[in-house]
Structures are given as structure tokens and as C-alpha cells.
């Protein structure tokens, strides 16, 4: 019985590259077959077949079938050790949740698995599944639920010895706080995660996630793009080594850093590099267009890139936030360059030169006047911008302060001399 299953499993593996459907059918037949619990070889083959089938279903985008497999194998989990059962459930659930083809059943399936783990009194598995649920809540923007479950889980994990899972949950807490724009708490959670991670061996995926979040926090809070770039590069190498779909995201953030560092010419070199070449596509093309627009200081090209690659640029909150700031800086530079030769200029003329609507130009100019980027007023009645010369700086206060400081030094010197005489 076991020998036949081994032969079938080997045949399924040999068909992986040529005929995936046939391989899936063979693995299905092995998984559905009843086996004796005391037949160790048959149990091992069935376990390998379940993992291989799950991986194949994920690669072929069969999300519903993978969800069904996760429920179907539960009776079999009682015939293997708790550690193996936990690894099997986690692996299948990770495959299901990492798929691009969302079914809308992710949270429901995760909750079902948690309930099953509770009923079977599998504490470690339940905690691992709850960590995945926190991740799901974060992905679906249910931030308050993510924080509530995460804080409960952190209290439990700090009393136990599963440091890797503790790092995972601390990272999720940092991501959630960052999404809620609470940067001090996001940084504190990240620092806790890095401290915990220093004491253990981190698997490549966890280390890459840690580097990715470090890069995001450095970019968001400190605008330290050089440090952020090095973190994103480490994350990219980590994700690339395990063929994770998140590798492309870290590559996009690397390209974003180069644009924000005002070195858009490096973007082309990065994209055509050996490591990044396999990720060529719309995601990298989007950043290449933004880099070109930034290099040319062209608002029209920038807006075209944002329109043509809406999903790739606007749907990513990290990229969207920083590109909005880049666009703002680019607009200010363009406006200052346009108005520089004038002392009085029509707003319509400015809007025609930089190819933006009159209302947008008016709004931006009034903001720049309030921020003291230049001195002037908007005459909305006549639709003109009047620019004043830079007012001379009154140096009376500086001179007075300098005089007082010098007098203070003289008084101190006289006091010290008088002290020596007495």
C-alpha cells in the first residue's frame, strides 16, 4: 500500500513541470485514500502529498480548492504528531492567504481553523493562527480589531518561549500603528521586534519582513532615504531567496528611494540589474515613468504616470504618500521658476505654462504665500499674482543682542579682576 503511494507520489513530482493538472489529480487520489495510522511510510507520503498539492493549488490560483483541502485534512491531523499537524495547517493556511486570488472567505476560514485548534486544545497552533488573523485584519484595513487581538496575543506570547511568533506579532503591531499614522508607537513596536529578533535565529521570510518595516519607518518618520534603501535592499534579497511575491514590493520601494534621493538616473540601472531583471513588468515600469518625470521636472509626465499606472502607484499607501510629497515639491519648483521673471502676472498665464487648472494653481500659490516661499499677494478680482521683492532683513535686534553679549563679557571680565584684587 505504502510502496504504491510512494511510486504515485514520485510520478506526480515528475509531472510538475510538464502536466500540472495530471500531477494534481494523482496527488488528490493519494490525499483521499484511507491509510493505517501505524503505517509510518504511508502517513509520511500522505503528509508530503498534502503539502505538494497545496503548493500546486496555490500556484495555479485555485483558492476555493485549497480552502477545501484545509478543511478536508483535519481528520488526518489526529494521526500525526501535534508539531507536524501544526506545521501542516500553518503551511496550507499561509499558501491560501498569500494567494493573489482573494475569495473573500479568508477571515472566515482563519476563524474556523482557530476554533478547531481551540477544540483540539492545540495552544501553540491557535496562537500561530491568531497571528495570521491579525495579519488578515491588517490587510483588510480592520485596524482596531488587529490591535485588540494583537495586544491579547502579545500578553500571552511574552509568557511563553515562541520568540519568532512574538517578533511576527510585534511587527504586525508596528505596521498597524503606522497605517493609523501613529509613528511613535509604530517605531516603539518595531524596536521591540528588533530587540526580540536579536536573541533568536530569524527565518528568511521573517527577517525580510523586519527589514521591510524598518525601511518603511525610516522613510516615513525620518525621511532617511539612504538607510531606508539599504533596509529595502536586504528585504528584497530575503524575499527573492524564498521566491516570495513581496520581493517586487521591496524592489518598488528601492526605486522610490532613488527617486526621493533625487537620483532618478539610478532607477534604470537598478531595474536592468541581474537580480531585478526577472521582476520586470508594470510595477517597475510605473516607477521608471515617475523617475523620468522627476528627472525632466515635468508635471505633465508625472500626472500621466499616475493616471497610466493608477493601480501600481496610487493603490500602494506607502508609494502614494511619498509620491504626493514629491509631486508637491515638483509643483513648487515649477511655479517658482515660472513666476521668477515677473512682478505682476496673470494666474491664467501661469496655469497655461505649467498645464494645470487655474483653481489648482491659485490654491497652491496661496499656500506658498502663507508658507513664505515667496512674498506676494493674489488679486482675485483681476486674476493676477503680484510679486514683491524680498523685504530687507531688519538687523537691529541682532546688533542689540551682540552688544548685550559683549557688555556681558566685559562685566564678567571686570568682576573677575575685582575678585582677584580683593
Swiss-Prot record:
First-listed, main subcellular location of the protein, grouped into a coarse class: nucleus
Protein location: Nucleus; Cytoplasm, Cytosol
Description of what induces expression: By FOXO4; expression in embryonic stem cells (ESCs) is mediated by FOXO4.
Post-translational events: Phosphorylated by AMPK.
Expression tissues: Highly expressed in embryonic stem cells (ESCs). Expression decreases as ESCs differentiate.
Modified residues (N-acetylalanine): 2
Modification Phosphoserine, positions: 14, 23
Self-association state and partner proteins as the record states: Component of the 19S proteasome regulatory particle complex. The 26S proteasome consists of a 20S core particle (CP) and two 19S regulatory subunits (RP). The regulatory particle is made of a lid composed of 9 subunits including PSMD11, a base containing 6 ATPases and few additional components.
Any one GO biological process: proteasome-mediated ubiquitin-dependent protein catabolic process
PROSITE patterns given in the database record: PCI
Protein name as it appears in the record: 26S proteasome non-ATPase regulatory subunit 11
Functional note: Component of the 26S proteasome, a multiprotein complex involved in the ATP-dependent degradation of ubiquitinated proteins. This complex plays a key role in the maintenance of protein homeostasis by removing misfolded or damaged proteins, which could impair cellular functions, and by removing proteins whose functions are no longer required. Therefore, the proteasome participates in numerous cellular processes, including cell cycle progression, apoptosis, or DNA damage repair. In the complex, PSMD11 is required for proteasome assembly.
Consequence of substituting residue 79 to A: Does not affect phosphorylation by AMPK
The organism of origin for this protein: Homo sapiens
Keywords noted in UniProt: Acetylation, Cytoplasm, Isopeptide bond, Nucleus, Phosphoprotein, Proteasome, Ubl conjugation
Pfam families in alphabetical order: PCI (PF01399), RPN6_C_helix (PF18503), RPN6_N (PF18055)
Protein family: Belongs to the proteasome subunit S9 family.
GO cellular component: cytosol; extracellular region; ficolin-1-rich granule lumen; membrane; nucleoplasm; nucleus; proteasome accessory complex; proteasome complex
One MF annotation (Gene Ontology) recorded for this entry: structural molecule activity
Crosslink feature (Glycyl lysine isopeptide (Lys-Gly) (interchain with G-Cter in SUMO2)) location: 274
Domain PCI: 224-392
Amino acid at each position: 500500500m505504502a510502496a504504491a503511494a510512494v511510486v504515485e507520489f514520485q510520478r506526480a513530482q515528475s509531472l510538475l513541470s510538464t502536466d500540472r493538472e495530471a500531477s494534481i489529480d494523482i496527488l488528490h487520489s493519494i490525499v483521499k485514500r484511507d491509510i493505517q495510522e501505524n503505517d509510518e511510510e504511508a502517513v509520511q507520503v500522505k503528509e508530503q502529498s498534502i503539502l505538494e498539492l497545496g503548493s500546486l493549488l496555490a500556484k495555479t490560483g485555485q483558492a476555493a480548492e485549497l480552502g477545501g483541502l484545509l478543511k478536508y485534512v483535519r481528520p488526518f491531523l489526529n494521526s500525526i504528531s501535534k508539531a507536524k499537524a501544526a506545521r501542516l495547517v500553518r503551511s496550507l493556511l499561509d499558501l491560501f492567504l498569500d494567494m493573489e486570488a482573494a475569495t473573500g472567505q479568508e477571515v472566515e476560514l482563519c476563524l474556523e481553523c482557530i476554533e478547531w485548534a481551540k477544540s483540539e486544545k492545540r495552544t501553540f497552533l491557535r496562537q500561530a493562527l491568531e497571528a495570521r488573523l491579525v495579519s488578515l485584519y491588517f490587510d483588510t484595513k480592520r485596524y482596531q480589531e488587529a490591535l485588540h487581538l494583537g495586544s491579547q496575543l502579545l500578553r500571552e506570547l511574552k509568557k511563553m518561549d515562541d520568540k519568532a511568533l512574538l517578533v511576527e506579532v510585534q511587527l504586525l503591531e508596528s505596521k498597524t500603528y503606522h497605517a493609523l499614522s501613529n509613528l511613535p508607537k509604530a517605531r516603539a513596536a518595531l524596536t521591540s521586534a528588533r530587540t526580540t529578533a536579536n536573541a533568536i535565529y530569524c527565518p528568511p521570510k521573517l527577517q525580510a519582513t523586519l527589514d521591510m518595516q524598518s525601511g518603511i519607518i525610516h522613510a516615513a518618520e525620518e525621511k532617511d532615504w539612504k538607510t531606508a534603501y539599504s533596509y529595502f535592499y536586504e528585504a528584497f534579497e530575503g524575499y527573492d531567496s524564498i521566491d516570495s511575491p513581496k520581493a517586487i514590493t521591496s524592489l518598488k520601494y528601492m526605486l522610490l528611494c532613488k527617486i526621493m534621493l533625487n537620483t532618478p538616473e539610478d532607477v534604470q540601472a537598478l531595474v536592468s540589474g541581474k537580480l531585478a531583471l526577472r521582476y520586470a513588468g508594470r510595477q517597475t515600469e510605473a516607477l521608471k515613468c515617475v523617475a523620468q518625470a522627476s528627472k525632466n521636472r515635468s508635471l505633465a509626465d508625472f500626472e500621466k504616470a499616475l493616471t497610466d499606472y493608477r493601480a501600481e502607484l496610487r493603490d500602494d499607501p506607502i508609494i502614494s504618500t511619498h509620491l504626493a510629497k514629491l509631486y508637491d515639491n515638483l509643483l513648487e519648483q515649477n511655479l517658482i521658476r515660472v513666476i521668477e521673471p515677473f512682478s505682476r502676472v496673470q494666474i491664467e498665464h501661469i496655469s497655461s505654462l505649467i498645464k494645470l487648472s487655474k483653481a489648482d494653481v491659485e490654491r497652491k500659490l496661496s499656500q506658498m504665500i502663507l508658507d513664505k516661499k515667496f512674498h506676494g499677494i493674489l488679486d482675485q478680482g483681476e486674476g493676477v499674482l503680484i510679486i514683491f521683492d524680498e523685504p530687507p532683513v531688519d538687523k537691529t535686534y541682532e546688533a542689540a543682542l551682540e552688544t548685550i553679549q559683549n557688555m556681558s563679557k566685559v562685566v564678567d571680565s571686570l568682576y573677575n579682576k575685582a575678585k582677584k584684587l580683593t
